[in-house]
UniProtKB/Swiss-Prot annotation:
<keyword id="KW-0132">Cell division</keyword>
<feature type="domain" description="Cyclin N-terminal">
    <location>
        <begin position="26"/>
        <end position="151"/>
    </location>
</feature>
<dbReference type="GO" id="GO:1900087">
    <property type="term" value="P:positive regulation of G1/S transition of mitotic cell cycle"/>
</dbReference>
<dbReference type="InterPro" id="IPR048258">
    <property type="entry name" value="Cyclins_cyclin-box"/>
</dbReference>
<keyword id="KW-0963">Cytoplasm</keyword>
<keyword id="KW-0472">Membrane</keyword>
<keyword id="KW-0131">Cell cycle</keyword>
<dbReference type="GO" id="GO:0000082">
    <property type="term" value="P:G1/S transition of mitotic cell cycle"/>
</dbReference>
<dbReference type="GO" id="GO:0031965">
    <property type="term" value="C:nuclear membrane"/>
</dbReference>
<comment type="function">
    <text>Regulatory component of the cyclin D2-CDK4 (DC) complex that phosphorylates and inhibits members of the retinoblastoma (RB) protein family including RB1 and regulates the cell-cycle during G(1)/S transition. Phosphorylation of RB1 allows dissociation of the transcription factor E2F from the RB/E2F complex and the subsequent transcription of E2F target genes which are responsible for the progression through the G(1) phase. Hypophosphorylates RB1 in early G(1) phase. Cyclin D-CDK4 complexes are major integrators of various mitogenenic and antimitogenic signals.</text>
</comment>
<keyword id="KW-0195">Cyclin</keyword>
<feature type="region of interest" description="Disordered">
    <location>
        <begin position="264"/>
        <end position="289"/>
    </location>
</feature>
<keyword id="KW-0539">Nucleus</keyword>
<keyword id="KW-0597">Phosphoprotein</keyword>
<comment type="subunit">
    <text>Interacts with either CDK4 or CDK6 protein kinase to form a serine/threonine kinase holoenzyme complex. The cyclin subunit imparts substrate specificity to the complex.</text>
</comment>
<keyword id="KW-0832">Ubl conjugation</keyword>
<feature type="modified residue" description="Phosphothreonine">
    <location>
        <position position="280"/>
    </location>
</feature>
Amino acid sequence: MELLCGEVEPVRRAVPDANLLHDDRVLQNLLTIEERYLPQCSYFKCVQKDIQPYMRRMVATWMLEVCEEQKCEEEVFPLAINYLDRFLAGVPTPKTHLQLLGAVCMFLASKLKETIPLTAEKLCIYTDNSIKPQELLEWELVVLGKLKWNLAAVTPHDFIEHILRKLPQPSEKLSLIRKHAQTFIALCATDFKFAMYPPSMIATGSVGAAICGLQQDEDVSSLTGDALVDLLAKITNTDVDCLKACQEQIEVVLLNSLQQYRQDQGDGSKSEDELDQASTPTDVRDIDL
């Protein structure tokens, strides 16, 4: 007789507030304040002497894998990357402290967005115990001070529902478009070239790339090509040419990620367990442009 209780209490989430989603003032306020939370410079050129772009990409990929394995809310990873970039834009940091900084940023973002946030002990385990919980807690205060406790940053996820609501999409397709757009946002967060893009542009480009990638199904959208881009640009007051360029860059990043995944899959030296680990954002392998 099995006495072990296997019940798992579901995570409690607030339902979407229609009053907020249908009030254009909310979207306008997001557009007004979003640039306050961007890094102030391309910090590899003028601030960081020890950290290189590939190091940032490695720690961002590690952070994404941790968030996926812990089934964090979609907003946690981009928000943590926002903290990381803003800190690095102002504070010269040794490369030996980069993973510690990434862990602290996830720690803070999960406190803001998760019902049950990540613990310091769990994050230390993900670093193979190369950092101690007390060290993480001490650095938490350092990061908070440098960010001036300004943690409620605007991220691309804040725009997704506002954009989807204004598109002439079949309701049954919205969840798939949303899922793909969230994947693109995660991909953008791992690539520094998007670090200084406004969140609204990343969100708009991600939605556009998601719809274009799903247009193999004729019923996905009543808008295509330039008409779709024009509508998306109008929703978020984005320059059309800038939006097209952003969407093209997102698609290139996706293709590079897919190619890397296929190379890893074909590498006979990798074990099946290694291949099963999340090395690309959720469902990237299921997306076809």
